[in-house]
């Protein structure tokens, strides 16, 4: 259990930061009014009744909560099967779980997810998202990165094969 303590702390910190920022957005940012921070980044409070990019919004609150719980359970399963030396992957799994639970809290409390980050140019804009979504994306990237660098790792306990090559 001790080896999981930093990751559990990261999950709690991700949820707390996500919920705190969403509270600030809900109480201080007008609904669907763009507040430019820099030329390509704005705050824009809106609600997402689906999952990523409003997908599955027709599933309803209960269906989306069930999907989120199943995803968290699956990621927990993967995380527990990850060797302790894979710090990058474990960190990624913790961020995914923290982000998913942050959005799950929104959905359970409000019936929607609070989104507020908008990347844009004068002629284009990206989907509006939140910090929990960013945690999920960064976490997934870390898991993939760990897998990619894992291909280059030599097994530490591998011994040269004593089998003779076949003469075929």
From Swiss-Prot:
Substrates-to-products reaction catalysed: Release of signal peptides from bacterial membrane prolipoproteins. Hydrolyzes -Xaa-Yaa-Zaa-|-(S,diacylglyceryl)Cys-, in which Xaa is hydrophobic (preferably Leu), and Yaa (Ala or Ser) and Zaa (Gly or Ala) have small, neutral side chains
Keywords: Aspartyl protease, Cell inner membrane, Cell membrane, Hydrolase, Membrane, Protease, Transmembrane, Transmembrane helix
Main location group: membrane
GO cellular component terms, A-Z: plasma membrane
Pfam families per record: Peptidase_A8
Pathway: Protein modification; lipoprotein biosynthesis (signal peptide cleavage)
Membrane topology: Multi-pass membrane protein
GO molecular function: aspartic-type endopeptidase activity
Active site: 115, 133
GO biological process: proteolysis
Family membership noted in the UniProt record: Belongs to the peptidase A8 family.
Entry superkingdom: Bacteria
Cellular compartment(s): Cell inner membrane
Enzyme class: hydrolase
InterPro entries to which the protein is assigned, alphabetical: Peptidase_A8
Species, as recorded: Mesorhizobium japonicum (strain LMG 29417 / CECT 9101 / MAFF 303099) (Mesorhizobium loti (strain MAFF 303099))
Function according to Swiss-Prot or TrEMBL: This protein specifically catalyzes the removal of signal peptides from prolipoproteins.
Name of the featured protein: Lipoprotein signal peptidase
Residues spanning the membrane: 5-25, 37-57, 59-79, 85-105, 125-145
EC number: 3.4.23.36
